[in-house]
């Protein structure tokens, strides 16, 4: 039997994190069922694979798992996802060419904006953010492209801005090396409005020099991404994955900087109990709960 860990497109945020987790997981279980990383252009489609029993673990944005559990749009029926652990808290943000007149999000009106693959979690994040700011999708031209394709389109001036996932990621790094770009900021009060009206968002800082073109700190929308499984997943398998994560909170950021917020997220587990990890009301899997109790993160 082979275990499968579902992620996004190759080279993306989720894919790069899963590669490190799966390596540690397999290393900790010599002789156990091997786990492999799979990739899908649209991670929300992984929920269907969970429902069909074709995935054992997966990475998703925390806001979508509650919808999957409840069968709310874009999902057509309840899907029994269970939480394993958070993966990162990272910024989602718009990027424009440095010679563009686009300075803040309001300047995107009337422009061509790449939002990620159609139907993807990133595209739906963009919808939520524009709606919270009262910006209609009719006021600009949405373009649905993968992140690598969008980067090329920005360089070729086929689009005016693109929507970017948490960094570091390969597509953003390569874009910043190929072209002069900048982060699109929020006008006064816009970021506070988004964070106050959408409970699964938070403010997060893109650090200066995070990539070429990030010339100053930039406050952006942050989202927690999480590792999930299905309620039918065997307790010992989920226990093993959760134990690997909780035992490597210092090592994981050295393997991939996307994990740098992980230890702080685990501090919430110790302070507030399982609810700190149960985003969208999705329960912690019993195997994960047992691992965290054994390692002292839960009573």
Annotate each PLM feature.
Residues 22-31, 51-55, 70, 131-135, ...:
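Sec-exported extracytoplasmic/periplasmic mature domains
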Residues 32, 38-58:
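Divalent cation-coordinating acidic motifs and surrounding scaffolds
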Residues 62-64, 70-73, 100, 136-236:
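Pocket-lining segment of extracytoplasmic ligand-binding domains
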Residues 115-128, 200-267:
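Ligand-binding clefts/hinges and TM-proximal coupling segments of bilobed small-molecule sensing domains
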Residues 149, 156-157, 166-183, 193-196, ...:
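An extracytoplasmic/periplasmic, membrane-proximal ligand-sensing/linker region
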């Amino acid at each position: 039997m082979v275990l499968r860990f579902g992620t996004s497109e190759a080279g993306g945020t989720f894919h790069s994190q899963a590669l490190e987790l799966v390596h540690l997981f397999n290393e900790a279980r010599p002789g156990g069922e091997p786990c492999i990383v799979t990739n899908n252009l649209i991670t929300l489609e992984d929920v269907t694979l969970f429902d069909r029993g074709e995935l054992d673990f997966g990475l998703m944005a925390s806001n979508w798992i509650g919808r999957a559990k409840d069968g709310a749009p874009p999902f057509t029926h309840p899907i029994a996802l269970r939480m394993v652990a958070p993966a990162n808290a990272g910024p989602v943000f718009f990027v424009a060419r440095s010679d563009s007149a686009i300075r803040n999000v309001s300047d995107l009106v009337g422009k061509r904006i790449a939002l990620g693959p159609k139907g993807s979690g990133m595209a739906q994040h963009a919808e939520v953010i524009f709606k919270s700011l009262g910006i209609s999708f009719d006021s600009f031209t949405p373009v649905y492209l993968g992140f690598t394709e969008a980067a090329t389109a920005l360089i070729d001036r086929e689009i005016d801005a693109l929507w970017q996932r948490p960094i570091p990621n390969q597509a953003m790094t390569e874009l910043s090396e190929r072209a002069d770009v900048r982060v699109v900021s929020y006008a006064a009060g816009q970021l506070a409005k988004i964070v106050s009206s959408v409970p699964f968002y938070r403010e997060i800082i893109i650090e200066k020099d995070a990539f070429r073109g990030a010339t100053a700190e930039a406050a952006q929308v942050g989202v927690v991404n999480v590792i999930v499984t299905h309620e039918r997943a065997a307790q010992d398998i989920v226990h093993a994955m959760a134990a690997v994560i909780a035992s490597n909170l210092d090592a994981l950021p050295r393997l991939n900087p996307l994990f740098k917020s992980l230890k702080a997220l685990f501090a919430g587990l110790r302070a507030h109990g399982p609810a700190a990890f149960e985003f969208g009301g999705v329960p912690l899997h019993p195997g994960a709960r047992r691992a965290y109790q054994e390692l002292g993160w839960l009573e």
